[in-house]
């Protein structure tokens, strides 16, 4: 005889318990006589019922019957089908779980009934399995983090050693750039001085040959030059009195007239020298 048949009362019909009378009588269940009737809740089928101590089962059955005040029946299909059909009642798993939790806590330091025993939390083992499966992944992640931290610390220790050569390379590059800039400036200065040196003789030659872009200095007008040329043809050397007269006639100073006659004599001397050389070369056949 199984433990299920020990605490099941087959003589009672499906009705309210005598310990908790109700004003209105509940009609008996309209099931066939060959069905085994139960006075309390049966959570498991007969072959699936756990073979544990009957004391815990009775306490749990009394607790559920006292808290709910109603019963329900389970119908087995004559053994041909293993399924069970619970009759609609006021049974709630949350209420039974709460009352059972209170009962075990008030009685003493007895351990709480396992949820898997009463079928309240069937998915709990899967959760535990997922946690156990996730713990190796967490451990591997922590190991990777520790290895990464050690690697970064080693790199940080090695960085000061590499920092010195890098700083030296940067200094060398900056020095090379500075030296190249200095050389470029020196070359520019040399080129500027060279152009200045070449331009000075060019300007001097242009000034001598009167080929420069600057206009020649011409302080005398045409009328003044003509009057001075006429006087020079008559007399190459002027007295002080004559010089004063000419200066008044052409509206020039005494000094200007004096300088003009000096320059004109030098020009005449140069022309006579060139003419003499030309005559000599033509006579002696120098080519």
UniProtKB/Swiss-Prot annotation:
DNA-binding region: 213-272
Biased segments, Polar residues type: 93-109, 149-158
Record localization: Nucleus
Residues covered by region (Disordered): 70-210
CDD domains the UniProt entry points to: homeodomain (cd00086)
Keyword Nucleus: yes
InterPro entries, per the entry: HD, HD_metazoa, Homeobox_CS, Homeodomain-like_sf, HXA10/ABDB-like
Major place of residence: nucleus
GO molecular function, a single term: RNA polymerase II cis-regulatory region sequence-specific DNA binding
Claim: NAD is one of the keywords in the record: no
GO CC terms, sorted: nucleus
Keywords linked to the UniProt accession: Developmental protein, DNA-binding, Homeobox, Nucleus, Transcription, Transcription regulation
Stated family: Belongs to the Abd-B homeobox family.
Purpose of the protein: Sequence-specific transcription factor which is part of a developmental regulatory system that provides cells with specific positional identities on the anterior-posterior axis.
Record-given protein name: Homeobox protein Hox-A10a
Organism: Takifugu rubripes (Japanese pufferfish)
């Amino acid at each position: 005889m199984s433990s299920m048949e020990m605490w099941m009362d087959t003589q009672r019909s499906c009705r309210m318990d005598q310990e908790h009378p109700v004003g209105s009588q509940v009609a008996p269940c309209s099931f066939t006589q060959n069905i085994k009737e139960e006075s309390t809740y049966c959570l498991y089928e007969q072959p699936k019922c756990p073979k544990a101590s009957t004391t815990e089962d009775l306490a749990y059955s009394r607790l559920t019957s006292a808290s709910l005040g109603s019963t329900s029946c389970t119908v087995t299909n004559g053994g041909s089908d293993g399924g069970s059909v619970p009759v609609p009642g006021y049974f709630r798993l949350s209420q039974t779980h709460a009352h059972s939790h209170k009962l075990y806590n008030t009685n003493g330091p007895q351990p709480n009934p396992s949820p898997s025993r009463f079928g309240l939390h069937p998915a709990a083992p899967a959760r535990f399995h997922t946690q156990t499966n996730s713990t190796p992944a967490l451990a591997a992640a922590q190991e990777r983090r520790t290895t990464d931290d050690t690697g970064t610390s080693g790199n940080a220790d090695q960085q000061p050693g590499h920092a010195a050569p890098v700083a030296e390379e940067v200094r060398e590059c900056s020095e090379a750039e500075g030296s190249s800039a200095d050389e470029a400036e020196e070359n520019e200065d040399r080129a500027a001085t060279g152009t200045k040196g070449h331009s000075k003789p060019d300007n001097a030659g242009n000034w001598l040959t009167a080929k420069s872009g600057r206009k020649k200095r011409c302080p005398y007008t045409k009328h003044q030059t003509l009057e001075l040329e006429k006087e020079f043809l008559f007399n190459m050397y002027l007295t002080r009195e004559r010089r004063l007269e000419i200066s008044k006639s052409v509206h020039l100073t005494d000094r200007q007239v004096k300088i003009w006659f000096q320059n004109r004599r030098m020009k005449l001397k140069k022309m006579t020298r060139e003419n003499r050389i030309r005559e000599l070369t033509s006579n002696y056949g120098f080519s």
